């Protein structure tokens, strides 16, 4: 059979969490701020807005957090896809460093946020291994890592093919680089923590509420949803990889990327 007996049609990260139930079904028809998307982006925005004293509603086409926020690999790194060399070639050394620094800042920020807000989500600085599929790729990884270490004081560990079994238990790759400060988190627990913070701050959350059309009305907005019309003074689009024709301008600028992990 193609599917294992333990296969289930929901994220394994959700195991052990209480089901959300029907407590997120109602909508508020008139709010200061409406947020479309209840993932990390939408909930973080709702927490700050609600704490500032404004009435905010978060809607989602599925259950809160049904998308990538509870189905990702849980890795937290400082990395961006292009290498340091490619960033410098396109943007120059100063801008390339600024882009890299944003990643460093984000990792420090989320650790402090989790600690300050007391979110139980198994945050851990476990390190991350970047494996090389060829000797050529290994040479590139090492060159970039040494440059990052020298220019930005980022800790790195070079692992040869001979030593990688100590890290991965396999000889498949051609060595790699360890970034020891990279972290991991239980993404579903982190999302649930954000959800609880948003509710505590006074935000309203409505799941299974699909946004179908956005109309601009003078200086405000009317959003037609599967549960009725919602009026708001300000609108936040927090749909990320699920961005659709609802917002064509944003859709043209977002590229969904698949990410896969193996649960063992």
Predicted regions and their residues:
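Glycine-rich FAD pyrophosphate-binding loop
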Residues: 51-71
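Redox-cofactor binding/interface segments in oxidoreductases and associated redox assembly factors
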Residues: 36, 78, 237-238
């Amino acid at each position: 059979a193609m599917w294992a007996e333990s296969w289930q049609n929901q994220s394994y990260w959700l195991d052990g969490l209480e089901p959300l139930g029907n407590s997120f079904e109602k909508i508020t028809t008139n709010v200061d701020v409406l947020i479309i998307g209840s993932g990390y982006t939408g909930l973080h925005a709702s927490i700050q807005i609600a704490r500032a004293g404004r009435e905010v509603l978060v809607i989602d086409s599925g259950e809160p957090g049904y998308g990538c926020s509870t189905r990702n690999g849980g890795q937290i790194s400082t990395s961006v896809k292009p290498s340091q060399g490619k960033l410098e070639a396109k943007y120059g050394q100063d801008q390339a460093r600024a882009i890299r620094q944003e990643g460093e800042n984000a990792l420090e920020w989320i650790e402090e946020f989790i600690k300050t807000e007391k979110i139980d989500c198994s945050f851990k600085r476990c390190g991350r291994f970047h494996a090389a599929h060829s000797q050529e790729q290994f040479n590139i990884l090492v060159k970039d890592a040494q440059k990052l270490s020298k220019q930005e004081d980022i800790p790195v560990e070079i692992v040869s093919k001979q030593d990688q079994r100590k890290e991965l238990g396999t000889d498949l790759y051609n060595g790699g680089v360890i970034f020891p400060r990279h972290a991991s988190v239980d993404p579903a627990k982190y999302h649930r923590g954000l959800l609880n913070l948003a509710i505590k701050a006074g935000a309203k959350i409505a799941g299974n509420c699909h946004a179908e059309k956005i109309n601009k009305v003078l200086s405000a907005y009317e959003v037609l949803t599967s549960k009725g019309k919602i009026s708001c003074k300000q609108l936040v689009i927090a749909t990320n990889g699920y961005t659709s024709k609802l917002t064509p301008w944003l859709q043209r600028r977002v590229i969904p990327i698949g990410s896969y992990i193996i649960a063992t």
